[in-house]
């Protein structure tokens, strides 16, 4: 198992089992033809959906949203009933949101008004690897390099979550210790080139982590789903450890082969177009679209594989909580033939570089003293 301990793997598996159990309890809402046959049946379905997802709407808002809920329910049921795609949809917590609200709240948070920071580590370290020599499947969750699924809430912080997945991963690979890191520090403190809940870019976040000496733990600086004052110095008093990186590299754009080279060695941050209805209500299976390449959401690729029907896929960790998709993950079709990969997954991929094999003690990082 190399540097990653068996204890880490067992702990990750236990956490995953508990998360799956919790998801099944809160979000399993069957939908049949009879649920859509009349207004009364649809109202009953809407009430069951609200109860399952613990959504409370006042009377006027409920009536305003009911039309959207009906449209979404018909879209989901029609897709699943046709059965002409290898993935299914379900009525998740976005059930009574229209596309405009969904985009404004949960996607569209990759900042485009400032350029991404150039890589501080030149080149592409995995370029010499032969694709034919790569393992047929990779899953960094099974190797203990991925923390549990998190939830960004109503904050445009996907860029921070995507960044953290990759940094947590390479740190676990290098040190054998899986440490949950703080997205909130990035939201509050990485303000020169990123903009908290209003969006940001993963490349900029990697450079912030490098230039400021590391990233503190989630336990010391927990997530609040809102931008606040940078309190990293105070949080450091409760955290003797900060995770350091040497910088980042970009995966050559639009190359799924190069993305595979990188993912075979570590989790990788990517951007995708996630604002479509099919992505919004994804439940299970290999996602084959519809989606374009208007990149609006940061996620992380933590593996790849081949489904039973022979379709290759990327394993993607999202930040919409464990009740979305496959316990918080989506399998996106790999090698689809689309330029830049399906949903643009290979267009803007990057990953942190870490050679220092131990988490750094906070007291060793003089750069933080001025925070």
From Swiss-Prot:
One of its GO terms (molecular function) is cysteine-type peptidase activity. SUPFAM superfamilies: Cysteine proteinases. It holds the Pfam family Inhibitor_I29. It is an enzyme of class 3 (hydrolase). Induction: Synthesized by the aleurone cells stimulated by gibberellic acid (GA). Repressed by abscisic acid (ABA). The keyword NADP does not apply. The keyword Methyltransferase does not apply. It comes from the Eukaryota. Belongs to the peptidase C1 family. This is Cysteine proteinase EP-B 1. It comes from Hordeum vulgare.
């Amino acid at each position: 198992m190399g540097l990653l301990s068996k204890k880490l793997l067992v702990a990750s598996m236990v956490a995953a089992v508990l998360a799956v159990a919790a998801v099944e309890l809160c979000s399993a809402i069957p939908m049949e033809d009879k649920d859509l046959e009349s207004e009364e049946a649809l109202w009953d379905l809407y009430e069951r959906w609200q109860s399952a997802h613990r959504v409370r709407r006042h009377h006027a808002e409920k009536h305003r949203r009911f039309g959207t809920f009906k449209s979404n329910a018909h879209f989901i049921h029609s897709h699943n009933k046709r059965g002409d795609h290898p993935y299914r949809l379900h009525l998740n917590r976005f059930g009574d949101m229209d596309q405009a609200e969904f985009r404004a709240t949960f996607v569209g948070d990759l900042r485009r008004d400032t350029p991404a920071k150039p890589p501080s580590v030149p080149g592409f370290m995995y370029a010499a690897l032969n694709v034919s020599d790569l393992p047929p499947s990779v899953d960094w969750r099974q190797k203990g390099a991925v923390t549990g699924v998190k939830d960004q809430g109503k904050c445009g912080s996907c860029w921070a979550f995507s960044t953290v997945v990759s940094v947590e991963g390479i740190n676990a690979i290098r040190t054998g210790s899986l440490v949950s890191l703080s997205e909130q520090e990035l939201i509050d403190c990485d303000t020169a080139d990123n903009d908290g809940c209003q969006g940001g870019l993963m490349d900029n976040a990697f450079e912030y982590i490098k230039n400021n000496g590391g990233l503190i733990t989630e336990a010391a600086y927990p997530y609040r789903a809102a931008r606040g004052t940078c309190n990293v110095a105070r949080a450091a008093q409760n955290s003797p450890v900060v995770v350091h990186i040497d910088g980042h590299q970009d995966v050559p754009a639009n190359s799924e082969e190069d993305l595979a080279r990188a993912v075979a060695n570590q989790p990788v941050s990517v951007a995708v177009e996630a604002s479509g209805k099919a992505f919004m209500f994804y439940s299970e299976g290999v996602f084959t679209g519809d989606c374009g390449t208007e990149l609006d959401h940061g996620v992380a690729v933590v593996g790849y594989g081949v489904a039973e029907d022979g379709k290759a896929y990327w394993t993607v960790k999202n930040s919409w909580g464990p009740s979305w998709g496959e316990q918080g993950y989506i399998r996106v079709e790999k090698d689809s033939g689309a330029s830049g990969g399906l949903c643009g997954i290979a267009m803007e991929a990057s990953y942190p570089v870490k050679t220092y094999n131990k988490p750094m003690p906070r007291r060793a990082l003089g750069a933080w003293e001025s925070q």
